[in-house]
Amino acid sequence: MRCSRDEHADLFRATLGGMGLTGHILEVEFRVVPIPTPWIVQETESVRDIDEFLAALAAAARDWPFTVGWIDCLARGARLGRGVLFRGRWAEPAEAPAPVPRPRGGPTVPFELPSWALNDLSVRLFNAVYAGVHARRGRRRVVHPQRFFWPLDGVRSWNRIYGRRGFTQFQCVLPERERPGATRRLLTAAAGRGGASFLCVVKDCGAEGEGLLSFPRPGVSVALDLPRRAETQQLVEVLAELVIVEGGRVYLAKDSFLRADQLARMEPRLAEFLRVRARWDPGRRLRSAQSVRLLGDPA
C-alpha cells in the first residue's frame, strides 16, 4: 500500500511518529537538499545561565540552520543552565579544506564502569572539563559533520560509562514562548533530584510535525541521559508531570517509563491516532511493549 499527503492521508499522518504501529515501511521517497561542501562551519559560545542560553539559542536560530546546546544540568542557583551553545551551517567552498572529510576515531571506554563511579562528583568533574575544553577552542572552526551532529560518538563505547544497567534518555519539548520559565523549571526539578546526567542537550524546536503523534512543536527541546537506577521511574514520572503542566510533550521514540494516563493527558491528538489505527488495524495485530504499556494493547 502507498500512502502520502494525497493518498490515504490519514494513514500517512498516523505513520509519521506512529512508533511502528501502522505497519512496516518498506520504501520511502523524500526530497534531498544539495549542500555546498561536506564540512560544517561551527561556532561555540559559552553561556552563564539559562536565561542567557535561551536568548542565545533564539538569536542563533534566526541565522544558523543547526543549533544545539550542552548544559551542565547539575549547576544550580545563579548558574543554572550554564553551558556551551553550538551553531552550525554547511561550509561554502571557499571556507572548506580541500580533502573530503573523514571521521576520526577517538578514545575508547574499555570496560563498563562500576555503578558507584557515576555520581554527582564525577559528573561535576566531567562538566567542568567539557566546558573548559570548548571555552579554549575558540568561537569558529570547520569540522566534520559527524563531530558536530554526534559529538559523543567521538568517544567510542561511551555508553559503558553508565555501567551494566545502562541509561535511558528523557526528551521533551516545552512551549517556552507560551510558558516562560518552563525550561528553567524542568532543569531545576532534574538537578534537585540528582539525575546525575553527563549529557543534557537543549535545542530550538521548529514547526509542528505533520504526524498525529509527531514530536516536534515550536519550543525548546531538552534531552537528559539518565542512569538506570531504582529511582529512575519516579524521576521520569516527576519530569513528565511537569511537562504536562507546562503544555509540552515527551519524545515517544526515546520513552521507556511514561504511564498511560500521562500520555492521555499530554497528547490531545491521541484520540485521532487511535481512531485511524482502529480503521487500519482493528485487531491491534501490530503492537509493541510500549503500546502495551501506553495504549492498553494485549501483551
PLM regions and their residue ranges:
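Noncatalytic alpha-helical scaffold of FAD-dependent oxidoreductases
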Residues: 1-299
